[in-house]
From Swiss-Prot:
Keywords: Acyltransferase, Cytoplasm, Iron, Metal-binding, Transferase, tRNA processing
Binding site for substrate: 143-147, 176, 189, 289
Protein name (Swiss-Prot/TrEMBL): tRNA N6-adenosine threonylcarbamoyltransferase
GO molecular function, one term: N(6)-L-threonylcarbamoyladenine synthase activity
Binding of Fe cation, residues: 120, 124, 317
Bound cofactor: record note: Binds 1 Fe(2+) ion per subunit.
Family under the similarity heading: Belongs to the KAE1 / TsaD family.
The encoding gene: tsaD
Species: Polynucleobacter necessarius subsp. necessarius (strain STIR1)
Keyword tRNA processing set for record: yes
Gene3D superfamilies documented for this protein: 3.30.420.40
Domain of life: Bacteria
Compartment annotation: Cytoplasm
Catalytically driven reaction(s): L-threonylcarbamoyladenylate + adenosine(37) in tRNA = N(6)-L-threonylcarbamoyladenosine(37) in tRNA + AMP + H(+)
Major localization listed first in the record, in broad terms: cytoplasm
Amino acid sequence: MIVLGIETSCDETGVALYNTTPWGEGKPAFQGILGQGLHSQIAMHRDYGGVVPELASRDHIRRVLPLLDQSLAQSSLKLTDIDAVAFTQGPGLAGALLVGSAFAKSLAQGLNLPSIGVHHLEGHLLSPLLGQTAPQFPFIALLVSGGHTQLMKVSGIGHYELLGETLDDAAGEAFDKTAKLLGLDYPGGAAISKLAEQGRSGIFDLPKPMLHSGDLDFSFSGLKTAVLNQVKKFEEKKIAISSEIAQFHADLARSFVNAIVAVLVSKSEKALKQTGCKHLVLAGGVGANLQLRSALNEKATRNNFEVHYPPLELCTDNGVMIAFAGALRMLAKNNGSTTSGAFDIKPRWDLQSNNLV
């Protein structure tokens, strides 16, 4: 079964073709990703310091068809070779979701194909299954992105239990806001992580929110405020030496990243102990953070559990994860999982409410 995946939830337009089984008879004998195209809107939104929803929607309209053509060309397929269409139904920006939904539904209807709406987070948490060492069910998923920070127990395809989540800012959002305080470009996640590598540990005693709360929830707004207070104190000194300013920013970035990593690692380890799971999946945009990966690997070696990651190129939003998750959903429901004819989207959508019965 060849599934077309379309991702337009925020500021990346992603299109991909995934083949569930190796077949012959004129169709690809290769199982896996057949072709993909991805366009990021980062450059367009940088001047605004964040995503502008209207601009995002318009750009998705411009990009989605050329990316489909690109994916078909890569895979040497025609539209008539596609067996199903999967698209991001939510959560995300309403206008952006509507572009992908309308495109996918119209294409599916024109080709008389089934279509399936995919939960964006399900795409992320299943993407490590595409890695070299796939996790075994059940596993714990740490979903960390600009909009979400959650711990999930994953018992199988379509069977998810929320164990904990952020009570305010997501970790990725805290990265972006802190980067802005330090004068770094949008998006700040990668920039602040790179800056932190130049910093010294232990210079600032930043809080590690809810580290000892006893539950699996998160909170990062207080950490962001603590960084702001340190910036204000430094500015009051009116230091004009550029090297001192640069070192201050690097040291503060290091302390900030260390604080977030400590909380994420501690809560993940606690979730594994509470559930008895031996496999941890790290997914979402922050999943590309090398400091977090290193800390999890070190903890896994010491405490006898395994950590699984998606390929680095699949940490950001992409069409591959939507095609893959849609294919797994359809196989789990014997190809019977289709959406209604309306261009229905779910900007706010609880993953557990989408569990298979």
